[in-house]
Swiss-Prot record:
Enzymatic class: hydrolase
Family: Belongs to the SurE nucleotidase family.
The name this protein goes by in its record: 5'-nucleotidase SurE
Gene3D superfamilies, per the entry: Survival protein SurE-like phosphatase/nucleotidase
Annotated function: Nucleotidase that shows phosphatase activity on nucleoside 5'-monophosphates.
Naturally occurring in which organism (per UniProt): Archaeoglobus fulgidus (strain ATCC 49558 / DSM 4304 / JCM 9628 / NBRC 100126 / VC-16)
Source organism phylogeny: Archaea, Methanobacteriati, Methanobacteriota, Archaeoglobi, Archaeoglobales
Cofactor: a divalent metal cation
SUPFAM superfamilies: SurE-like
Length: 261
C-alpha cells in the first residue's frame, strides 16, 4: 500500500509527524509537504513560478519539501515522487479545526485533499481543534495522541473498504475534548463573522487585517455542532459543486435571455 501524506502547516509541523507515525504500519508513507507554513491558501496552484523540491530528513521522516502550495505538493507527490496514484492520500493532521463551507474552500488542508481526490485517490483530510489558542503560538504544545488514533482507525477502514458510493473524500475534525464517538455530519454554512480592521504601519501607511470571530449558532447535524459536543466529525464530501436543482428551473429563471452573434 502506498500512502501520500501532506499538510498545509509545513514539514516541521508536529501534526505531520503524528500522522506519519499513525500511518506507517499501514503502508509505505511518502511525505511531500510545503517547505513553510501555507495555511489558508485553499486549493491554489503555482502556475506563475517554478516549484523547487528538496529531499530532507525531519523528525526521522524522509520528506520532500516543496517550495509551493499543498496542492503543488499533492501533484508532485503523485506524479514525480511516487509516480502513480497512491492507495490513500492524507492531508494533516492540521493544527486547528477546518469546519464549514468556509474551510472547504479556504483551507490548504482540505484543498490538498480535494486535489488528491480529483486524481482518483481515496482521501482523508484531518484536523485537530485548538480552542482559544493561536496555532502559530502553541504548535509545540498540541497533543496529537487521540487524533493519531482517529486517523489510524479511519485510514485502515478506507484503505480496505474504500469510500461509500458518491463520496470522494472525508473531512475529519477531532475535538480538543473528545467523547470517544463519531458523528457523520454536513458542512455548516459558515463558522466566522468576518471583520476588517484598518491599521497604520510605522510610516503612517494604511494596511488591513482580516479576522473572524466564531459564530455562536451551530445547527444540529453540522460539523461545528458535533465538534462542540465532543464528537469526532466525519463529513463526506464530493468534488462536484453543482447545485442539486432541476436544470429546467434554472433555465426558466433565465427564459428569453439570448444574444445576437
Amino acid at each position: 500500500m502506498k500512502i501520500l501524506l501532506t499538510n498545509d502547516d509545513g514539514l516541521y509541523s508536529a501534526g505531520l509527524k503524528a500522522a506519519y507515525d499513525a500511518l506507517s504500519e499501514l503502508g509505505e508513507v511518502f511525505v511531500v509537504a510545503p517547505a513553510v507554513q501555507r495555511s489558508g491558501v485553499g486549493r491554489s496552484l503555482s502556475i506563475m513560478e517554478p516549484i523547487r523540491v528538496s529531499e530532507v530528513k525531519v523528525n526521522g521522516m524522509r520528506v520532500f519539501a516543496v517550495d509551493g502550495t499543498p496542492t503543488d505538493s499533492v501533484i508532485i507527490g503523485m506524479y514525480e515522487v511516487i509516480g502513480e496514484i497512491p492507495d490513500l492520500a492524507v492531508s494533516g493532521i492540521n493544527l486547528g479545526e477546518n469546519l464549514s463551507t468556509e474551510a472547504a474552500t479556504t483551507s490548504g488542508t482540505v484543498g490538498a485533499a480535494l486535489e488528491a481526490a480529483t486524481h482518483g485517490s481515496k482521501t482523508i483530510a484531518i484536523s485537530l481543534q485548538m480552542p482559544d489558542v493561536s496555532k502559530f503560538e502553541l504548535t509545540s504544545k498540541a497533543d496529537f495522541s487521540f487524533a493519531s488514533k482517529v486517523l489510524r482507525g479511519i485510514a485502515e477502514i478506507v484503505l480496505y473498504k474504500g469510500l461509500p458510493e458518491g463520496v470522494d473524500l472525508l473531512n475529519v475534525n477531532v475535538p480538543a475534548k473528545p467523547n470517544g464517538k463519531i458523528a457523520v455530519t454536513r458542512l455548516a454554512r459558515r463558522m466566522y463573522r468576518v471583520s476588517v480592521e484598518k491599521r497604520l504601519d510605522p510610516r503612517g501607511r494604511e494596511y488591513y487585517w482580516i479576522y473572524g470571530e466564531e459564530t455562536e449558532d451551530a445547527e444540529e447535524g453540522t460539523d461545528i455542532h458535533a465538534l462542540r459536543q465532543g464528537y469526532v466529525s466525519i463529513t463526506p464530501l464530493k468534488i462536484d459543486l453543482t447545485a442539486s436543482v432541476e436544470f429546467d428551473i434554472v433555465e426558466g429563471w433565465f427564459d428569453g435571455l439570448e444574444w445576437e452573434v
